[in-house]
């Protein structure tokens, strides 16, 4: 294959995953509007399932009391909700703080990683639905009712994720919120047409009969949805189930967080059957190819497009790359500054994806985890 053809292929795949796929999803949503799955209504007048809300925590003393209080304030029958804090090797007083705050069950576990803590908590409870949340994520009062509604509406639903909004109390932005809005639009349409291709750790739930233990180095966010779809379950989004989470204050910090996340993600991509379409519906396979496979291939595709591009286009790419790596580009006034900040965010995230792969191949991926700096604020109460 000649260089021009290689360039067109790489550029075309990048254009498809970034622009073409979202447009195709939007068109499919419109064409299938009458056939797409209706969003389930809230379930106040239905028999509500029992729910165990599991909060894995490592060194979360400063925020765990606020999180437990937030869980207790959810608009869900108290007799059907069990709040569990699964402490993963916390030596900072997190277990004691969780007990004082009123958690129903506090597990003081040896250090084993987030997934091990979650699995242990699931094994020690018996609710119909198992919900999960991070210690620094605060749910809206009706979030749990909204999260369980799809399980009630359809017995084929095995996984449901909600929506998390990233906030910065200081008023700044690391661009994660803007990217996340784009991601949420894709997820909403994927859910309506088939199933989501990934979730989030801030707000999600699994039907107990669908729950599977995954490798401790593979997080639920990426691994569970496509695994459960392969088992015949639906993995949906509940748009009305909302949570907020404090973002990392700056783009550089967000890039460092993404690099750590990508080290875990590459474990799933390469060793967690994410590239194996067997058992998936054809539509879901196309979604995984467009949204996930190409997303992780993007850094390599960018490199191929750069090397094989015509000279003038290569010069433009290098100019844009150089500008994006200059912090000042995001501080320019007006639309130019906003565009520069988004470009910088995109380039740094591509870099984080590539470096995450390097970290995974060089060092492997550990099950341990730590809260990213700047995403926790001490509870004054």
Where are these regions (language model features)?
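Catalytic donor/gating beta->alpha subdomain of glycosyltransferases that bind UDP-sugars
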Residues: 151, 155-183, 216, 220-288, ...
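Short aromatic/hydrophobic "clamp" motif used to bind/position activated sugar donors
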Residues: 130
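Short, acidic, metal-binding catalytic loop of nucleotide-sugar glycosyltransferases
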Residues: 69-80
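Basic/Trp-rich segment in TM-proximal cytosolic loops or flexible interdomain/linker regions
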Residues: 35-43, 257-321, 339-342, 364-381
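Long helical/loop segments within the catalytic core of UDP-sugar-dependent glycosyltransferases
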Residues: 110, 115-117, 121, 127, ...
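N-terminal membrane-anchoring/stem segments of glycan-assembly enzymes
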Residues: 1-43, 191, 321-327, 352
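Acidic helix N-cap motif at the loop->helix transition within catalytic regions
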Residues: 62-66, 91-100, 142
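A conserved acidic beta->alpha catalytic loop
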Residues: 52, 60, 70, 84-95, ...
């Amino acid at each position: 294959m000649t260089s021009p053809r290689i360039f067109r292929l790489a550029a075309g795949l990048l254009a498809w995953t970034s622009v073409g796929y979202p447009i195709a999803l939007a068109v499919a949503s419109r064409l299938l509007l009458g056939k797409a799955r209706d969003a389930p209504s809230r379930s106040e007048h239905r028999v509500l399932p029992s729910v165990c809300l599991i909060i894995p925590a490592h060194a979360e003393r400063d925020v765990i009391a606020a999180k437990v209080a937030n869980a207790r304030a959810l608009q869900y029958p108290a007799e059907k909700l069990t709040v569990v804090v699964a402490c993963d090797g916390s030596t900072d007083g997190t277990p004691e703080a969780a007990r004082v705050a009123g958690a129903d069950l506090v597990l003081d576990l040896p250090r084993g990683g987030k997934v091990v803590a979650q699995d242990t908590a699931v094994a020690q409870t018996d609710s119909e639905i198992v919900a999960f949340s991070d210690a620094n994520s605060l749910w809206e009062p009706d979030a749990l009712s909204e999260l369980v509604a799809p399980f009630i509406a359809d017995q084929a639903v095995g996984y449901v994720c909600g929506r998390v909004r990233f906030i910065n109390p200081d008023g700044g932005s690391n661009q994660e919120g803007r990217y996340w809005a784009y991601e949420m639009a894709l997820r909403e349409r994927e859910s309506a047409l088939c199933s989501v291709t990934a979730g989030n750790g801030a707000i999600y739930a699994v039907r107990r009969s669908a729950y599977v233990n995954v490798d401790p180095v593979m997080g639920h966010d990426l691994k569970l949805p496509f695994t459960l779809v392969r088992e015949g379950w639906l993995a949906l989004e509940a748009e009305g189930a909302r949570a907020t989470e404090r973002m990392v204050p700056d783009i550089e910090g967000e890039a460092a967080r993404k690099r750590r996340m990508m080290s875990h993600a590459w474990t799933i991509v390469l060793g967690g059957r994410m590239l194996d379409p067997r058992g998936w519906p054809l539509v879901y396979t196309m979604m995984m190819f467009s949204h996930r496979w190409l997303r992780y291939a993007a850094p390599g595709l960018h490199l191929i497009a750069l090397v094989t591009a015509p000279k003038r286009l290569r010069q433009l790419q290098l100019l844009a790359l150089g500008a994006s790596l200059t912090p000042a580009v995001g501080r320019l006034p007006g639309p130019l500054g906003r565009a520069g900040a988004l470009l910088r965010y995109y380039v740094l995230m591509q870099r984080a994806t590539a470096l995450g792969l390097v970290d995974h191949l060089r060092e492997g991926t550990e099950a341990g985890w730590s809260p990213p700096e700047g995403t926790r604020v001490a509870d004054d109460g």
